[in-house]
């Protein structure tokens, strides 16, 4: 089953006269990792280059049962080029993650993510789930003012997201966790904000 990720810019602050948020655009992303090896992600960039979607085939961890494993972990690193015109800088405002957990008694899953512009250090988040669970989840990461990192003024940047999902079980009970979406709801939503600069 393919998993959908939608990356979209929601540009929130007022524009300077010489550059507008309409000039900000996203490029073709690069990706890699055990959760998104080469050839397992389909990328669609919108005509206005303001949003893109990625379809994942393998971002899922499974343990117990026929796997014979008590622990599994996968990761995915994504790099998205962001064109930033002169007179503007951008920052990440929040990112939402959607997925699914099937966790029996005593099983756990853990989702970790850090996001940053290349060459900078950004915030990192961790969310742990404990069984019994058999449901979708939504993780909302809204950055505080102290955690926001701005790009250089008028400098094109790569927006990087390094994420991992792991699951652990006991007594060979089947458990799984994924970053996914079963409908048109995005699995990951990136919201950017921007400001004028000199």
List the predicted regions and their residue ranges.
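Proprotein-processing/basic-patch segments
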Residues: 167-198
């Amino acid at each position: 089953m393919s998993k959908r990720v939608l990356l979209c810019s929601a540009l929130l602050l007022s524009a300077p006269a010489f550059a507008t948020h309409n000039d900000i655009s996203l490029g073709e992303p690069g990706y890699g990792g055990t959760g998104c090896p080469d050839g397992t992600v389909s990328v669609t960039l919108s005509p206005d280059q303001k949003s893109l979607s990625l379809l994942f085939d393998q971002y899922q961890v499974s343990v117990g049962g026929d796997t014979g494993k008590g622990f599994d972990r996968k990761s995915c690193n994504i790099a998205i080029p962001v064109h930033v015109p002169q007179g503007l800088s951008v920052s990440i405002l929040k990112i939402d993650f959607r997925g699914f957990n099937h966790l029996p008694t005593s099983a756990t899953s853990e989702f970790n993510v850090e996001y940053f512009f290349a060459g900078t250090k950004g915030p990192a988040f961790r969310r742990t789930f404990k069984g019994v669970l058999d449901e979708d989840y939504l993780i909302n990461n809204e950055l505080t003012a102290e955690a926001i990192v701005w790009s250089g003024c008028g400098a094109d940047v790569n927006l990087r997201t390094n994420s991992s999902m792991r699951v652990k079980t006991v007594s060979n009970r089947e458990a799984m966790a994924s970053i996914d979406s079963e409908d048109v709801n995005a699995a990951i939503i990136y919201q950017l904000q921007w400001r004028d600069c000199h």
